Amino acid sequence: MNIEKNSILNIHLNPEGILRIVLNNPKSHNTLSEKMILSLQQSLDDAASDEKVRVVIIAAEGSTFSAGHDLKEMKAGRLDPDKGKSYFNKIMSQCSTLMQAIVTNPKPIIAEVNGT
């Protein structure tokens, strides 16, 4: 796994086996959009099965680690005919799966959070 950059995550594995996953949407304070959740989930799944990865560090660009769920995306979901019920069920299920991937991952996962 080398340096990988996309609009949501920057990922880099150094020679010592330290995988840095950097949330890269500082304009939205790194909100947990559906794309962010799915990208993180895939990255953690990949790390779990990669023998070169010894530890995972999740960091963030900008002054905010993450502001939580993307409220603009959630508001848009309410426009669906079911008033957002299926969207909310889907996004909460995806988020729950992501959190379980963090808890059950065989690699240690560290959150690098700015303390100011």
Where are these regions (language model features)?
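Small-residue (primarily alanine) positions within well-ordered alpha-helices
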Residues: 19, 43, 67, 111-112
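Histidine-centered beta-alpha loop that forms part of the nucleotide-sugar donor binding/catalytic region
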Residues: 24, 69, 114
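Hydrophobic pocket-lining residues within nucleotide cofactor-binding pockets
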Residues: 32, 71, 113
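Glycine- (often His-adjacent) and acidic-residue-rich active-site loop
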Residues: 60-100
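Glycine-rich beta-to-alpha active-site loop
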Residues: 96-116
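Conserved CoA-thioester-binding segment of acyl-CoA-metabolizing enzymes
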Residues: 1-61, 100
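Residues at secondary-structure transition points
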Residues: 27, 31, 38, 82-93, ...
